């Protein structure tokens, strides 16, 4: 995660945390990333059980640099905090390298993220101290998304 510039592809997706494992999936072809290159669950149009509700949005170099800075900073995380909220991610970030794939699911309701490496969950942490930084990047990536733009 420390150097996202090494990733071959970097895409962001809107996902529906409230509909995990239920409801209809988006129509075929709405995710424009080949599934053979994606780390997904057994459903072709979801990421770890969360339905994908947008096309892939390429993450630009500036956003990638900002994400690298925020995600690699130990001060981003509240290491000794436990929250009682339900993790309902609305955004997934997917970084694909030659030997490693990293997915980061972000929940702005509880300011938590989950990290998956090559399909295995390797972390879950609170990011309250850097919420505004992550939200700024996500708002830039999804300028037409009313739900994302309404977050503050």
Across the structure, where does each feature detected by a protein language model lie?
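Function-determining sites in protein domains
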Residues: 1-152
